[in-house]
Amino acid sequence: MERRDFKEQLKKTAHLARLHLTPEEEELFAKQLQNILDYFKKLQELDTSNVEPMAHVLPLYNIWREDEVRESISQEEALKNAPEIEDLGFKIPRIMKREE
């Protein structure tokens, strides 16, 4: 992906996530993400023909636990940084049209 296209994709993603990025942040994040993608390209060059396929990196079995009630943050605390609140919950932009 070309750098210009990559920056446009980053802007779209930031907009969807309702992040307001400065041009400097856009440049910084685009560079960081490009470095990550470049690293993935390096990983694809590794010879893994002798590596057994696995579902998990660590051999963990029966990791599920019983649900338990624990202290958590209050609803007020959870919503304090929300850009918009409606009916004591997060208000998000509509992404689907209603059938009339």
UniProtKB/Swiss-Prot annotation:
Domain of life from the UniProt record: Bacteria
GO molecular function, one term: ATP binding
Subunit structure: Heterotrimer of A, B and C subunits.
EC number(s) given by UniProt: 6.3.5.-
Family named by the database record: Belongs to the GatC family.
GO BP terms in the entry: glutaminyl-tRNAGln biosynthesis via transamidation; regulation of translational fidelity; translation
Protein name: Aspartyl/glutamyl-tRNA(Asn/Gln) amidotransferase subunit C
Catalyzed reactions per annotation: L-glutamyl-tRNA(Gln) + L-glutamine + ATP + H2O = L-glutaminyl-tRNA(Gln) + L-glutamate + ADP + phosphate + H(+); L-aspartyl-tRNA(Asn) + L-glutamine + ATP + H2O = L-asparaginyl-tRNA(Asn) + L-glutamate + ADP + phosphate + 2 H(+)
Pfam families tied to this protein: GatC
Keywords: ATP-binding, Ligase, Nucleotide-binding, Protein biosynthesis
Xref: InterPro entries: Asp/Glu-ADT_sf_sub_c (IPR036113), GatC (IPR003837)
Protein's job: Allows the formation of correctly charged Asn-tRNA(Asn) or Gln-tRNA(Gln) through the transamidation of misacylated Asp-tRNA(Asn) or Glu-tRNA(Gln) in organisms which lack either or both of asparaginyl-tRNA or glutaminyl-tRNA synthetases. The reaction takes place in the presence of glutamine and ATP through an activated phospho-Asp-tRNA(Asn) or phospho-Glu-tRNA(Gln).
Lineage of origin: Bacteria, Pseudomonadati, Dictyoglomota, Dictyoglomia, Dictyoglomales
Gene3D superfamilies: Glu-tRNAGln amidotransferase C subunit, N-terminal domain
